[in-house]
Amino acid sequence: MFPESDVLENLKIAGYLKKRKEVKASIEYVFDMFPALSKLKTRKAGFMSGGEQQMLAIGMALVVRP
């Protein structure tokens, strides 16, 4: 997680090796799983609470889909 980047940027960074369509679909999936995170799209990760940061970290892992 990059504290100086916002939620959407962090999710895009997590999927940088994937195709754009896949990343977009994965990000939508993350926002469906974590509706609270979708409301924080423009918030910098460093200014989020610990629980919100955990949601973002899990969301980033889901974008990668190992």
Language-model regions, residue ranges each:
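Signature (C-motif/LSGGQ) region and adjacent switch/coupling loops
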Residues: L37-K41
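ABC ATPase nucleotide-binding domain signature region
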Residues: Q53-M55
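Hydrophobic anchor residue at the start of the ABC signature
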Residues: I58
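Conserved ABC ATPase signature
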Residues: K44-M48
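A short, proline-enriched helix->beta-strand linker immediately N-terminal to the Walker B motif
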Residues: V63-P66
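ABC-type ATPase nucleotide-binding domains, specifically the catalytic core motifs of the NBD
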Residues: E4-K24, M33-P35
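Active-site beta-strand/loop architecture of penicillin-binding DD-peptidases
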Residues: V30
